[in-house]
Swiss-Prot record:
Alphabetical list of PROSITE patterns matching this protein: ZN2_CY6_FUNGAL_1 (PS00463), ZN2_CY6_FUNGAL_2 (PS50048)
Main function: Transcription factor that, with ptaR1 and ptaR2, coregulates the expression of the gene cluster that mediates the biosynthesis of pestheic acid, a diphenyl ether which is a biosynthetic precursor of the unique chloropupukeananes.
A Pfam family assignment: Zn_clus
InterPro entries per the UniProt record, alphabetical: Fun_TF (IPR021858), Zn2-C6_fun-type_DNA-bd_sf (IPR036864), Zn2Cys6_DnaBD (IPR001138)
DNA-binding region in chain numbering: 11-38
GO CC annotation terms, alphabetical: nucleus
Keywords for the protein's UniProt record, in alphabetical order: DNA-binding, Metal-binding, Nucleus, Transcription, Transcription regulation, Zinc
The name this protein goes by in its record: Pestheic acid cluster transcriptional regulator 3
GO molecular function term, any single one: zinc ion binding
Compositionally biased region (Polar residues): 97-113
Any one of the GO BP annotations: positive regulation of transcription by RNA polymerase II
Positions of region (Disordered): 71-123
Length: 564
């Protein structure tokens, strides 16, 4: 039987380089061997324009190929006196930078999230099965990107994150980065993207193209590893076996950020749903099959405080709580824009309890009690849209829930006011409460947002006079107390409150805030869509007397906003 006829064109990379291509899937062997991006066999890439962009990519590929061919130094350090580990190193070393030409591309049988840079194997000289650690050298290019991620990118993603000293700072993140191949490459892709945005005007066209290729290579590796990890996770879940899910779910969350920042339409929603699925599975299983120490599982199940529990337990508990809180927060934010019920709503009462060890105020700035109520408002909004709740048929139930939510918010704000007085007293005594004050300001802005959002869900844009005092209070706080550096933390309040702003000075204030340099950071390119949506809402409110909140939710661009 004759072989099927193959295209003579090959992948787009080989066509550009005018090289023979074996058309391997998902990438050809030639590109794999040289560790260059294989642009596949689909539609013609945008950069292939017979112009400068194509020339830049070609020059970049030539540069990488030349560099690859010269690189012969060993990639691994072996402790003195120990033989080199015969086990093939995890593939992370091959894709982390530009590898040597003799790099193996064998299919791995171990889970891709296992042992990123820390590789252990039983030594034949150890009859007791002792484990020996082989630490790989992080290439210079990767170390620059890795530190840029830790120092610059992660703080931009989580500007309110202030880890407690008992949590070991951001040590859990560094450990996870070096242990999880997919997360490592997700971080490097995001870091490469951010650095390229920052220095775009200061580097040559060739350097820009090289950075773009580097970014795509890391992103491609991350996506492949996440797909493999999800398959393994699904298999082990069905087999009721333990699995390493924390590295994978952290990788997926970083993909959400990357796709959002890079303006890749609504691709982020697919990965957010995947992260939610993993978190939900862990909670339903009560962590039984998550690859954590028993001590960590006990602390998490009983919602205990961290004490001096050892580095491993501290790392595992901190990672799970941080990522769990992040996923719940992102789930709520996406529900606000999509008009849907938060998928993790059933966990809010426990995870977001005031006494819970998961503190959203340390992750995104708003206190648990209020985010719990915002989740309820999102659910009420979702029921109206998805389940057809109407004032005529479900009026009593709808307004009863709304009244209870409003009462909870007002009670909470009264408590916050008392705490604010205590903060002012402490400040007068010379006590530094800058982080506490930031949380208080953030929570108050989210509280104003919640009251206004609740009104829009139940009354649309009618009876806005009932909100004048709330709007005025929010504007006073924004003008007098909220520093410019906090604007990125309150994008959601700025949007929701801005929706009901009056023409003139009020709308100008929200326009200026969302268009400010701190808001329109180069990493957050999607924020221009937030401001654009707000401008459209103001225009529609002005020209239509029957404009509703459902009309806002049905706006094409609004569905895919994530208020970060």
């Amino acid at each position: 039987m004759s072989n099927p006829v193959r295209s003579k064109g090959g992948c787009w990379t080989c066509r550009l380089r005018r090289k023979k291509c074996d058309e391997g899937k998902p990438e050809c062997t030639t590109c794999q061997a040289l560790s260059i991006t294989c642009y596949g066999y689909g539609p013609k890439p945008e950069w292939m324009d017979n112009g400068d962009a194509e020339k830049d990519v070609a020059n970049s590929l030539k540069h990488i190929v030349r560099y690859t061919s010269r690189r012969t130094s060993s990639r691994y350090r072996v402790p003195p006196g120990q033989k080199a580990n015969p086990k093939l190193a995890p593939k992370v070393h091959a894709a982390a930078s530009t590898p040597s030409t003799n790099t193996s591309h064998s299919t791995e049988t171990t889970p891709p999230s296992d042992n990123g840079f820390y590789d252990t194997a039983e030594s034949p000289l150890s009859p007791n099965g002792a484990q020996h650690l082989t630490i790989a050298t992080i290439p210079a290019e990767d170390s620059i990107l890795l530190m840029h991620f830790l120092d610059k990118v992660f703080p931009l993603q989580y500007p309110m994150y202030r880890p407690d000293i008992l949590e070991g700072g951001r040590g859990w993140l560094l450990a996870l980065l070096l242990q999880t191949k997919s997360l490592y490459h997700a971080a490097l892709a995001l870091s490469s993207y951010h650095r390229r945005m920052l220095v775009f005007e200061r580097i040559s066209e060739q350097c820009r193209a090289t950075a773009a290729v580097q970014q795509e290579k890391h992103l491609e590796t991350c996506l492949n590893e996440v797909r493999q990890a999800m398959v393994i996770l699904d298999q082990r879940t069905r087999q009721r076996k333990s699995y390493d899910g924390m590295g994978t779910v952290t990788s997926i969350v970083q993909l959400v950020f990357f796709e959002l920042f890079a303006g890749q339409d609504h691709a982020w929603r697919t990965h957010l749903n995947a992260a939610i699925d993993v978190y939900d599975q862990n909670c339903r299983d009560k962590l039984e099959h998550l690859d954590l120490s028993e001590a960590s599982k006990t602390i998490l199940r009983n919602d205990q405080r961290l004490a001096v529990d050892g580095a491993l337990v501290t790392q595992e508990v901190t990672t799970f709580r941080f990522m769990g809180g992040s996923i719940i927060w992102l789930d709520i934010l996406s529900s606000l824009a999509a008009g849907s019920v938060p998928r993790l709503l059933s966990y809010h009462q426990g995870v977001l309890d005031a006494a819970s060890q998961v503190k959203l105020e340390n992750i995104m700035g708003c206190k648990n009690w209020l985010m719990c109520q915002i989740g309820r408002i999102a659910a009420l909004q979702g029921h109206r849209r998805q389940d057809g709740w109407t004032s005529q048929r479900h009026g009593i139930k709808l307004h009863s829930i709304a009244a209870d939510i409003k009462s909870e918010i007002e009670s909470g704000m009264a408590r916050e006011a008392l705490e604010s007085l205590n903060i002012q007293t402490s400040d007068s005594c010379g006590i530094n409460n800058s982080s506490t004050n930031s949380v208080t300001l953030t929570t108050r802005m989210f509280a104003f947002m919640a009251i206004i959002h609740l009104h829009l869900v139940t009354h649309d844009f009618e009876r806005l006079d009932n909100l004048r005092e709330t709007i005025a209070d929010a504007i006073r706080l924004l003008q007098s107390q909220v520093p410019c550096s906090m604007i990125p933390v309150i994008v959601a309040p700025l949007f929701i409150i801005g929706c009901v702003a009056a023409q003139g000075d009020e709308q100008s204030l929200f326009r200026a805030s969302l268009a400010s340099d701190t808001s329109q950071h180069r990493l957050y390119r999607h924020r221009k869509d937030v401001l654009s949506a707000l401008e459209e809402i103001w225009s529609k409110r002005q020209t239509s007397t029957d404009y509703t909140w459902n009309d806002v939710l049905d706006m094409g661009q609004h569905k895919y906003l994530l208020f970060l």
